[in-house]
Amino acid sequence: MIKILSIGNSYATDATRYVYGIARADGVAMKVVNLYIGGCSLARHYRNMLGDAAAYDFEINGITATGVKLSIKDALLSDDWDFVTLQQASPLSTNYETYQPYLDSIAAYVRKHAPKAKLLIHQTWGYREGTPRLEKLKVATHAEMFEGAKKAYFLAAERICADGILPSGEAICLAMREKTEHMLLHRDEIHLSLGLGRYIAGLVWYGTLTKRPIAENTFRDFDEGVSEESVAFAKRIAEQAIIEYSTFQK
């Protein structure tokens, strides 16, 4: 069984929603856990880590476990993880200065308590075109925001000697450029759509983590409708991002 722990926020919720189902459709046993606090930044994860705060909702295989609150240490010690992922909160993702010194400390903490796990950077995506949130970040477009985040995430991965990058952001940026008018990638200004957007990110995670092909995957249990045209589109886009980042995976 492949075991993945994300120290994340709602972006990790979006990205991991379908990973377990995609794996199951491919006959691969997988456990996918997200430690969730909405909008949680690396600085807040760091403070929670120092205080051993049982502040996180526990999402397992895309579903929230009701009534369960965990600390980062609780989660790290709860299983023998194969992968642990880290990410920055989206409003801060373009500014590498906000990553430190928190990222270094969290990475060291993860390696102390989950020494066998590969440590990955989850590269998040840009906001929907036209949202005023882009102006607040002093960028004009989704692509411009993503380019800033991309540079910061590369610096982050290099700094902590990460074992790889999960290129969700790259895939969504590619999809934004190539999608047809009826293809919905965001459900609001910042989050992925419950169908196609989350599916693309899930394929990226699954393909990157397992190095297995995704073209013939039969998963279709979406939270909102995804046409067969969009399924094919998602697989093509995800595969493109996976291949582009394959040289960064150890």
Language model segments and positions:
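Residue-level detector of flexible, active-site-proximal loop/helix-junction positions
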Residues: 11, 39, 126, 172, ...
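Short hydrophobic segments within beta-strands
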Residues: 5-7, 122
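Alpha-helical cap/lid subdomain in secreted, periplasmic
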Residues: 69-195, 207, 216
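Conserved SGNH/GDSL esterase-like catalytic core that processes O-acyl groups on lipids
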Residues: 2-3, 11-100
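Conserved catalytic region of serine esterases and O-acyltransferases that act on ester linkages
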Residues: 185, 189-192, 196-250
